[in-house]
Structures are given as structure tokens and as C-alpha cells.
């Protein structure tokens, strides 16, 4: 079972109501916010049909997920996600948590106090294409597969 990372790249103006609702359901309220979602047919359909003009997504690997959790993971009170806190909720390390997330044993919503949204920065070096077009048309939007890992590492 794959775990997708979804990043919002485009802002609020001129969004259709169904796009706004889908972004709200995914908790992508601001540009450069990211969430982890399961590989589910309903989520996949929502991404492909409704949100392909506002977000980019792909399968995240374990190494990138560990870095994302270490550097951008937050708990209640806007404090960093630390190894001490992970031990309190039953995980010995970031690697163990990442493995549990990817295998589908646990989700971020199930963990007490862990915020499910990651606030990223704009990518260092900028985007390779425009954020107005799809990835297939020399843009940045839409499904990018494993290339999402390179983008996320530049946004941490």
C-alpha cells in the first residue's frame, strides 16, 4: 500500500467550489502545505479529477518521510516532533514511525498531539517549470510519482 504526499502549489483565487471543498477536506489551507494520504481510490479520484490544477502528489519513500518528520513534524503548541515525544506515544525512532506510516499500520491522525499538516518552504533553486501547467506539459502540477521526493527535500 502506497503513501502519497500531497503538496498545495496554487493559492485561493478563482478556485471552483468543489476544489475549495476538496482542499479543505485534505487540510491544505495554504500554499506549500503538505499532507500524507493513503492510496485509496476515492482520494486518487479526488486528486486526479478535482485537484490536479492546484496540487502535486506522488509516492513518498521512507528516507524522505524520516527527514520530513524530523525537520517539519510538529506537535500541539507548535513544538517540534522529537524522539522523546515519539517514545511517549510508543515509537522508538523516526524510522520506526515512518515504517508504520508507509505500511499503513498507523496514520498521523491516530497519533495524539501530532499535527497532520507539514508547513514547507518554497523549493530552493525554484521550480523547474511553471506552477500553472501540468507536469507533463513542462509544469509542476499533478501526479509526479517518486519525483516528489526530490521536490520535498528541496522544500524542507
From Swiss-Prot:
CDD domains the UniProt entry points to: Ribosomal_L7_archeal_euk
Keyword check for Metal-binding: no
Signal peptide annotation: none
Keywords: Ribonucleoprotein, Ribosomal protein
Recorded GO CC terms: cytosolic large ribosomal subunit
One Gene Ontology molecular-function label: RNA binding
NCBIfam families: PRK06049.1, uL30_arch
Protein name in the entry: Large ribosomal subunit protein uL30
Gene designation: rpl30
Amino acid at each position: 500500500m502506497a503513501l502519497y504526499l500531497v503538496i498545495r502549489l496554487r493559492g485561493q483565487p478563482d478556485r471552483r467550489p468543489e476544489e475549495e471543498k476538496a482542499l479543505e477536506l485534505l487540510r491544505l489551507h495554504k500554499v506549500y502545505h503538505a499532507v500524507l494520504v493513503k492510496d485509496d481510490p476515492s482520494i486518487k479520484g479526488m486528486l486526479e479529477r478535482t485537484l490536479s490544477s492546484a496540487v502535486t502528489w506522488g509516492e513518498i519513500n521512507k528516507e524522505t518521510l524520516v527527514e520530513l518528520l524530523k525537520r517539519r513534524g510538529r506537535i500541539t503548541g507548535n513544538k517540534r516532533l522529537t524522539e522523546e515525544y515519539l517514545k511517549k506515544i510508543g515509537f522508538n525512532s523516526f524510522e520506526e514511525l515512518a515504517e508504520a506510516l508507509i505500511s499503513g499500520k498507523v496514520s498521523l491522525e491516530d497519533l495524539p498531539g501530532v499535527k497532520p499538516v507539514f508547513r514547507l518552504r518554497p523549493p530552493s533553486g525554484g521550480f523547474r517549470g511553471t506552477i500553472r501547467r501540468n507536469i507533463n506539459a513542462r509544469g509542476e502540477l499533478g501526479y509526479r510519482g517518486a519525483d516528489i521526493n526530490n521536490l520535498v527535500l528541496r522544500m524542507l
